[in-house]
């Protein structure tokens, strides 16, 4: 079986690693991939980036399954193009991908189907948006509606900050066209929970929960990033919280998908906020999270390819996904200066200490390239160091021990991944 994985980050490395464990898979293509093709058997990088190029390659190579990690290509309609050519692809069609591609569309969908979320208004007119600020209490959340690599959300502490943010997004175009429409919503103070799930548009099966760490600096301070680390499961995801999530968010989401006839097999990533004991939906992502995937997939006992095939065959109602009764900690090692300005091309040392077959201690490649059997930095987030242990405390300790084994010039990681939580009793 030939599998094509679209994307170039640590998420795609984790997907390729998990998929490669299925004996039916004898070839993995990565488009464009990264240096992980050097540590996964029968994996080949293909330098393709556009939907049409990827489609033509899949036709030519008779690819059996394509898995899309990249949100941009999903919003661009890559799934629709594959389906028009009778090719099997896992991911949302263009309409369903708009639940991530447009925050304004997603909020309207939530409101229409009774999904519990923060109060909001969407604007394309900056003057009307500024006027609306007078009605808000602070802090307030301002979001660029379009895709902004996970960095398009600003929490403005006062009216001046809010107006400056609107100017940045709508006039100065700091997020390009993503900021043409903005969503202004009430600020919810609480704990964030990430829940990845899989759907065949008839049922949604949640994966285990996770806790992302978005900010660049300790104690969740500094600039937004794509994510600096993850723990799974999330200690705040109690049985009570899970029940509220299913009743107030998952079930109405599924109802909306059915009524809007968004017929697809893919991932729904629920970005949740628990505030004052209630669960709210902050956002949908319509693909695996990065770096959540790198912590969640190593905890999955079930065969991921079999799970995906069940979704493609609309058979999720007949399966159960099994999970390890363990905890995962993923620490992102980034290039110094990320997420603003950083160097590429620095030699990475210490990777040889990690056996690729060791499922308890893994290193997933993100911004990594290979030349002459040596690995070099090639992005802002460079490596994902993951440890699976019997307890969260042990997983955190082991992950940081492994981080110390790896070095490159100006490497940086947060020192507090997973340590901020307070154990929660249900």
Residue positions per predicted region:
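ATP-binding N-terminal substructure of ATP-dependent carboxylate-amine bond-forming enzymes
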Residues: 1-95
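Active-site "cap" helix and flanking loop/linker of ATP-utilizing ligase/carboxylase catalytic domains
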Residues: 246-268, 285-358, 370-371
């Amino acid at each position: 079986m030939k599998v094509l994985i679209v994307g170039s980050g640590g998420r795609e490395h984790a997907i390729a690693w998990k998929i490669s464990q299925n004996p039916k898979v004898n070839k993995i293509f990565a488009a464009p991939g990264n240096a992980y093709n050097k540590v996964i058997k029968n994996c080949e990088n293909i330098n393709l980036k556009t939907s049409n190029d990827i489609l033509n390659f899949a036709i030519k190579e008779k690819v059996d399954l394509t898995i899309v990690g990249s949100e941009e290509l999903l919003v661009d309609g890559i799934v629709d193009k594959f389906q028009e050519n009778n090719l099997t692809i896992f991911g949302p069609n263009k309409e369903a991908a708009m639940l991530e591609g447009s925050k304004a569309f997603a909020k309207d969908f939530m409101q229409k189907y009774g999904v519990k979320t923060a109060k909001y208004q969407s604007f394309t007119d900056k003057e009307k948006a500024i006027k609306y600020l007078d009605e808000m209490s602070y802090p307030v959340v301002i979001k660029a509606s379009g895709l902004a690599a996970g960095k398009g959300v600003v929490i403005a502490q006062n009216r001046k900050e809010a107006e400056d943010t609107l100017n940045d997004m709508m006039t100065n175009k700091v997020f390009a066209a993503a900021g043409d429409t903005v969503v202004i919503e009430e600020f919810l103070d609480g704990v964030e929970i990430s829940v990845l799930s899989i759907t065949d548009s008839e049922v949604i099966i949640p994966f285990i929960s996770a806790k992302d760490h978005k900010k660049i600096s300790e104690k969740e301070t500094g600039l937004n990033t794509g994510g600096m680390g993850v723990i799974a499961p999330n200690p705040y995801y109690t049985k009570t919280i899970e029940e509220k999530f299913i009743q107030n968010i998952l079930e109405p989401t599924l109802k909306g998908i059915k009524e809007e006839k968004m017929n697809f097999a893919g991932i729904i990533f629920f970005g949740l906020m628990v505030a004052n004991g209630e669960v709210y939906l902050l956002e949908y992502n319509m693909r695996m999270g990065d770096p959540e995937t790198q912590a969640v997939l190593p905890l999955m006992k079930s065969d991921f390819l079999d799970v995906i095939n069940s979704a493609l065959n609309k058979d999720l109602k007949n399966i159960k996904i099994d999970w390890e009764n363990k905890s995962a900690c993923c620490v992102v090692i980034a290039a110094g200066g990320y997420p603003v300005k950083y160097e590429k091309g620095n030699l990475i040392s210490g990777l040889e200490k990690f056996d690729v077959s060791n499922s308890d201690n893994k290193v997933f490649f993100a911004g990594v390239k290979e030349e002459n059997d040596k690995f070099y930095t090639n992005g802002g987030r460079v490596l994902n160091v993951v440890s699976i242990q019997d307890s969260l405390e042990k997983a955190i300790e082991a992950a940081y021990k492994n981080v110390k084994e790896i070095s490159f010039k100006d490497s940086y990681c947060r020192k507090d991944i997973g340590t901020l939580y307070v154990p929660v009793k249900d």
